[in-house]
């Protein structure tokens, strides 16, 4: 299962590394939107769950992963810009579905509010419109550690909060990845978090009101940072919304254990292809480094 790799020029401003997993029998294409500080590697398990039922597209933000060597990093990217990048990729790959994880939900909501004509359904996982007390504490500590380039504390912060239910192997991957990021990546994350802490989260609900396709909101039962209960606020704004809670799992859903992997896959595929019976897929734990998402 080798992807077709390309670095795409987006509007002459950004170059974006992409991986396209083409499945000959697949009728639909899904693009995956990762979270902050994450790379394409963070979706290794998700790709295995969706391929070959779908063609699968992964990409790295211009400041991250294998995109960053192709860009100058002269200015911070806003969520609006990330949303526009996603719209360009949806058009380029003719994607009918979008699946986001964690902070990737912000750019996805921005993109979907533009009502891209090709997109039929979307899944937004581990995201909520609420900054509750645990999330605020996490973000406030994060912006402090990032601002001081305290790599050790940033790495441990993730594993002791949103990543606390991950297997120890993935925690080691997370720590290694986060503590070795480039300075401009820390700057980008500091910019994002500062904006979240000082802005009106109602902007996500306003974007949600413009969405005219079915959206599944997927959250973990044990995730106290983007809780299933908080995510249900989207139901008052997305006209065609549904909700699924993955039992006995936290923020990282399918990465955390076999049952979470199975249940996440069944929820996603059951939503995207409700007429098909979901086949169970064996869980693969250690395939690639799994980057984390703020």
Please provide the spans of the model-predicted regions.
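Conserved HGGG/HGGXW glycine-rich cap/lid loop of the alpha/beta-hydrolase fold
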Residues: 14-69
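Active-site loop/oxyanion-hole signature of alpha/beta-hydrolase fold enzymes
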Residues: 58-99
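Gly/Ala-rich beta-loop-alpha elbow adjacent to hydrolase catalytic centers
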Residues: 100-104, 108
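Flexible "cap/lid" loop of the alpha/beta hydrolase fold
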Residues: 113, 121-150
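Conserved alpha/beta-hydrolase catalytic His-Asp/Glu region
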Residues: 133-135, 152-208
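Short beta-strand/loop motif that positions the catalytic acidic residue
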Residues: 211, 217-219
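Acidic catalytic loop of the alpha/beta-hydrolase fold
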Residues: 222-226
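Catalytic histidine-centered segment of alpha/beta-hydrolase-like enzymes
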Residues: 249-262
